[in-house]
Amino acid sequence: IRKMKNKKGFTLVELIVVLVILAILAALLVPALTGYIDKANYEKVVATTRSVVMAAQTEYSEAYGKGTAVALAATAEANTTDIGKAACKLAEITDSADKYINDIKSVKLTGTATDGVITKVEVTQGKYICVYEKNGLTSTTDYKYTSGNYGVKAAS
């Protein structure tokens, strides 16, 4: 009996109980963490789009002031037009060869030459597409996440 009392440490049952409790806690935390990860990814593409919107509006306003603004249609990639290339460089989303970086697959700008305003920007980054609409999103039901004039949906 004395030998049993002098033994220190945990019994096998105590260790198993602790492991079961840790497994239950981990199972409860995993769904919450994936929600945070998704929200962080949404915010990342929104931040990229905000940067593109600011850069595009800066370049477009400058062209409008010089009288060289042309209508931008969302059918062409931004890195193929002069204003788009300048905006992409300013937003730091292209390399020196005008190729997209940081998992950006597509950037499309829409602007009106009559008033020099960028009206719509669409950025595809990773698995998500973020859309900016100057006058607010026309429909918020299409998006998994919205923030002001920005909406994020899954890329197809």
Predicted feature residues:
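Short hydrophobic alpha-helical module
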Residues: 22-25, 36, 55, 59-62
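Short, low-complexity, Pro/Ser/Thr/Gly-rich segments in the mature regions of secreted, periplasmic
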Residues: 138-156
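Alpha-helix exit/C-cap motif
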Residues: 54-74
